[in-house]
Amino acid sequence: MEIKTNAKIRVRLESFNHELLTSACRKISDTIQNSDATKLSVVSLPTDKRIYCVLRSPHVDKDSREHFELRVHKRVIEIYYDPTVKCRIISKFRITVRSIISY
């Protein structure tokens, strides 16, 4: 008799475009649900917002400035699965697998 244990994969996705990130999460969740994974959860992380201040004039006029903003949207997908089943993960985006936890 074979004893099955559950394992967990945590996948972190980052993107500057939140619509692209949402579609990537949807594609990954559709792929995982078609396989034999037992549970899937998508968690939204706080958005990093960086503001850069640039002087417009090269010499004087410090009052004249421009502000640029860069936002990084993040999601974490946790996949609970049976270790004997191999899951396919879409690799079109920047994906980092932080940890594989087996319990």
UniProtKB/Swiss-Prot annotation:
Q: Which residues form the signal peptide?
A: none
One GO cellular component, as annotated: chloroplast
Predominant location category: plastid
InterPro entries per the UniProt record, alphabetical: Ribosomal_uS10 (IPR001848), Ribosomal_uS10_dom (IPR027486), Ribosomal_uS10_dom_sf (IPR036838)
Please name the Pfam families in this protein's record: Ribosomal_S10
What SMART domains does this protein map onto?
Ribosomal_S10
Gene Ontology BP terms:
translation
Q: Does the keyword Chloroplast apply?
A: yes
Q: Which Gene3D superfamilies match?
A: Ribosomal protein S10 domain
Listed A to Z, the keywords are: Chloroplast, Plastid, Ribonucleoprotein, Ribosomal protein
Molecular function (GO) terms listed?
structural constituent of ribosome; tRNA binding
Question: What compartments host this protein?
Answer: Plastid, Chloroplast
Q: Which NCBIfam families match?
A: PRK00596.1, rpsJ_bact
Q: What does this protein do?
A: Involved in the binding of tRNA to the ribosomes.
Subunit note: Part of the 30S ribosomal subunit.
Family classification: Belongs to the universal ribosomal protein uS10 family.
Q: Would you tell me the protein name for this molecule?
A: Small ribosomal subunit protein uS10c
* Native source organism of the sequence: Trieres chinensis
